[in-house]
C-alpha cells in the first residue's frame, strides 16, 4: 500500500510538472477577443517578475497611458500602447514566446529572446508615441525589455518589467457582425488562395512558387486540394497540417522538363488558414543554400468556381482568370531571415532606368552610399565598417535600407532618427564567425540622407580602450540605383583605415555634477557611469590611432632591448 501511494504521488508530481512546462493553450486563443474586434483595457507596469505575485509598481508605470487598445487583426490580437516622455524610450521589446526570458548578458543584444515593438504613430508636440505588439490573452503577463536614456541627467539603462492587463476593465469598442462560413457541395472547383507568413498577415514569398488558382475536390464532405509547384528544383519538400500535425503532401505527377510537379493534400476547414512548411534549395554566392520556412495558405471559398477536371484523370491546369492576379509579393533576397530563392533570367536584358523617388513595391534595389561626418561632406571613418552596396527593399510599399556592418562586436548600437527620436535599427541577420550583422531602417525613397547614431566600444585590443557615441549621415547615391529583383548581389568588403578615431570628442572622464536620477532600475543595479556623450560628436579621421600603436610598439621594443642587454651583462 505504501509503495502504491508513493507511485501515485510520483505520477501526480510528474503530471504537474508537465502541465507547468506546456504553454497555456487556452490563453493562446482568448474567447473574449473576436477577429476584427476592437477593445479597451487598463494596463500597468510592474517590476520584473512581480506582475503575477506581489505586483510591485515600476517607475516606468508613470510614463504610459494606462488605457490601452486591443485590436484583433486577421485572428491575431495586438495591443496598442501609448508611451509618454517618448524621447526617453530608446527601445521597447516584448518576449518572443510569451515566457519570461533571462536577462541578456549584453544589454543591447536581445533579439534572440525579445522582439521590438512596432511604432504606429508619433506626436512630437506631446512627446508621445503609440507602440504595437502581439498579445495572446488578457490574463498573460507581457514580459518586456526597455532601454531608457535621459541625457539631461546622464541616465542610461536597460531593464526588464512586467506589463499586465486588468481583465475586469475589459470593454468592447466594436465587434464585426457574425458571418456564416461558405460550405461547398460535392464537386470539382478551382479556388484562389494567398500564401501568408506564419505569424503575421503579410504576404509570404512562397506565393510565387505555386500556380494560382488551385484545384479543389469535395466528396462526402472531404476536401482535397491539388496545386502546381512551378519551381520543382527549388521547392524540395512541402508539408501541410492535418489532424494537428505537419504531413508530407502527395505528389500526383512531375514534369522535369518543365520543372514543375502537381501535389495534393487534404484540408479540414477551407475557411481557416492552413499551416504549411517548405524546404527549399537555392544558388547563393557560388554555392547551394538549403533553407526552410513556415507559412499559411488562405483559401477564398467565396470565389471558388466549378471546374470540369481534377488532377489524376485530367491534369490540365485550371484556367486563371486574367482579372485576378497573384498578390504582389517577392522572393526572399540576401540579408533577410529566409535567404534568397532566385530564378536566373533566361536571356540577358538591358537594365531599366530606375526612378529613385518612385520605387516599386516588392522590388529590391542595390545602391551606393556615403557615410559623412556629422553636418559635413567629409567621409567618416565609419564608412570603413559598412559593406557596399546597400540594398533597398520595398516591403508593403515602405522602402527599407539594408546595411551590412563589419567588426560587428565593436558596434554596440546603430540607430536612426525618426520624428526626432533615436530608434534602434532592426537586426536582420548576423554572422558571429565573420563578425558581421545586417540591419535595416525605413527611408522615404532612394535619395534619403539619414542621421545615424552609433556606440562604438573596443575592448579587445591590448593597451587600447575606446568607448564613444557619435553621429554620422548615411547619404544614398541615387545615381547608382539598380533594380536587382530576383538576382543575387555580392557585397564588397570596405577598405579598412587604421581604426575608428576621435580627436575632437569629449573624454569619457569629464562628467558634470551628479544629478538625482529617477529610479528606473527596478532591480537596484544601476550601472553608474561617468561618461559624457556629446549629442553631435564627430569622428576626427585625421587624428589616427596609429600614433598610439606606434608608441606602444616602440616602448615594447625598447624594453626588450634593455632586458636583453641586462642578461648579456
From Swiss-Prot:
Residues 34-173, 184-307, 360-484 form the NEAT domain. Disruption phenotype: Moderate reduction in growth rate at 37 degrees Celsius, reduced bacterial density in stationary phase (in strain LO28); no change in bacterial adherence to Caco-2 cells. 2-fold reduction virulence in mice. Does not impair iron transport. More sensitive measurements show that disruption decreases hemin uptake at low concentrations (0.5 uM and 5 uM; at 50 uM no effect is seen). Decreased hemin-binding and hemin uptake by whole bacteria at low concentrations of iron. Residues 307-357, 502-537 are annotated as: Disordered. A motif (NXZTN sorting signal) lies at residues 536-540. GO terms for molecular function: metal ion binding. Residues 502-511 have a biased composition (Polar residues). SUPFAM superfamilies: NEAT domain-like. This is Hemin/hemoglobin-binding protein 2. It comes from Listeria monocytogenes serovar 1/2a (strain ATCC BAA-679 / EGD-e).
Amino acid at each position: 500500500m505504501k509503495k502504491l501511494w508513493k507511485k501515485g504521488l510520483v505520477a501526480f508530481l510528474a503530471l504537474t510538472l508537465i502541465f507547468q512546462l506546456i504553454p497555456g493553450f487556452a490563453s493562446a486563443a482568448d474567447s473574449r477577443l473576436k477577429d476584427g474586434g476592437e477593445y479597451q483595457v487598463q494596463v500597468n507596469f510592474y517590476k520584473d517578475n512581480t506582475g503575477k505575485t506581489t505586483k510591485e509598481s515600476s517607475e516606468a508605470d508613470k510614463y504610459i497611458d494606462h488605457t490601452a487598445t486591443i485590436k484583433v487583426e486577421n485572428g491575431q490580437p495586438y495591443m496598442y500602447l501609448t508611451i509618454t516622455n517618448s524621447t526617453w524610450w530608446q527601445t521597447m521589446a516584448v518576449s518572443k514566446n510569451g515566457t519570461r526570458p533571462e536577462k541578456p548578458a549584453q544589454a543591447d543584444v536581445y533579439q534572440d529572446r525579445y522582439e521590438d515593438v512596432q511604432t504606429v504613430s508619433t506626436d512630437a508636440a506631446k512627446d508621445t508615441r503609440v507602440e504595437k505588439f502581439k498579445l495572446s490573452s488578457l490574463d498573460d503577463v507581457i514580459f518586456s525589455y526597455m532601454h531608457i536614456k535621459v541625457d539631461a541627467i546622464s541616465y542610461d539603462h536597460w531593464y526588464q518589467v512586467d506589463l499586465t492587463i486588468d481583465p475586469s476593465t475589459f470593454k468592447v469598442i466594436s465587434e464585426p457582425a457574425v458571418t456564416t462560413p461558405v460550405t461547398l457541395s460535392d464537386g470539382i472547383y478551382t479556388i484562389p488562395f494567398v500564401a501568408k507568413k506564419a505569424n503575421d498577415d503579410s504576404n509570404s514569398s512562397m506565393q510565387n512558387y505555386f500556380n494560382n488558382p488551385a484545384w479543389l475536390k469535395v466528396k462526402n464532405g472531404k476536401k482535397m486540394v491539388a496545386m502546381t509547384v512551378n519551381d520543382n528544383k527549388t521547392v524540395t519538400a512541402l508539408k501541410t497540417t492535418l489532424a494537428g500535425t505537419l504531413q508530407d503532401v502527395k505528389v500526383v505527377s512531375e514534369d522535369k522538363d518543365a520543372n514543375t510537379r502537381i501535389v495534393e493534400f487534404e484540408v479540414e476547414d477551407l475557411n481557416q488558414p492552413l499551416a504549411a512548411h517548405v524546404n527549399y534549395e537555392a544558388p547563393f554566392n557560388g554555392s547551394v543554400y538549403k533553407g526552410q520556412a513556415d507559412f499559411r495558405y488562405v483559401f477564398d471559398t467565396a470565389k471558388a468556381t466549378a471546374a470540369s477536371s481534377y488532377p489524376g484523370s485530367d491534369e490540365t491546369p485550371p484556367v486563371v482568370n486574367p482579372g485576378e492576379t497573384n498578390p504582389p509579393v517577392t522572393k526572399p533576397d540576401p540579408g533577410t531571415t529566409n535567404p534568397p530563392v532566385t530564378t536566373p533570367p533566361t536571356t540577358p536584358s538591358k537594365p531599366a532606368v530606375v526612378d529613385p523617388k518612385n520605387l516599386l513595391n516588392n522590388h529590391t534595389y542595390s545602391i551606393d552610399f556615403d557615410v559623412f561626418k556629422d553636418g559635413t561632406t567629409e567621409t567618416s571613418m565609419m564608412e570603413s565598417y559598412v559593406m557596399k552596396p546597400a540594398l533597398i527593399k520595398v516591403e508593403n510599399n515602405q522602402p527599407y535600407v539594408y546595411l551590412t556592418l563589419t567588426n560587428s562586436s565593436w558596434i554596440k548600437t546603430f540607430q536612426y532618427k525618426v520624428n526626432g527620436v533615436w530608434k534602434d535599427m532592426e537586426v536582420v541577420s548576423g554572422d558571429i564567425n565573420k563578425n558581421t550583422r545586417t540591419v535595416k531602417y525605413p527611408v522615404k525613397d532612394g535619395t534619403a540622407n539619414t542621421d545615424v547614431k552609433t556606440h562604438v566600444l573596443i575592448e579587445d585590443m591590448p593597451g587600447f580602450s575606446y568607448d564613444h557615441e557619435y553621429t554620422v549621415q548615411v547619404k544614398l547615391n541615387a545615381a547608382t540605383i539598380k533594380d536587382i529583383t530576383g538576382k543575387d548581389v555580392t557585397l564588397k568588403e570596405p577598405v579598412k583605415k587604421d581604426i575608428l578615431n576621435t580627436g575632437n570628442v569629449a573624454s569619457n572622464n569629464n562628467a558634470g555634477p551628479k544629478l538625482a536620477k529617477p529610479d528606473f532600475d527596478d532591480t537596484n543595479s544601476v550601472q553608474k557611469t561617468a561618461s559624457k556623450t556629446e549629442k553631435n560628436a564627430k569622428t576626427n579621421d585625421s587624428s589616427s590611432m596609429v600614433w598610439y600603436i606606434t608608441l606602444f610598439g616602440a616602448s615594447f621594443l625598447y624594453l626588450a632591448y634593455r632586458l636583453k642587454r641586462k642578461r648579456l651583462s
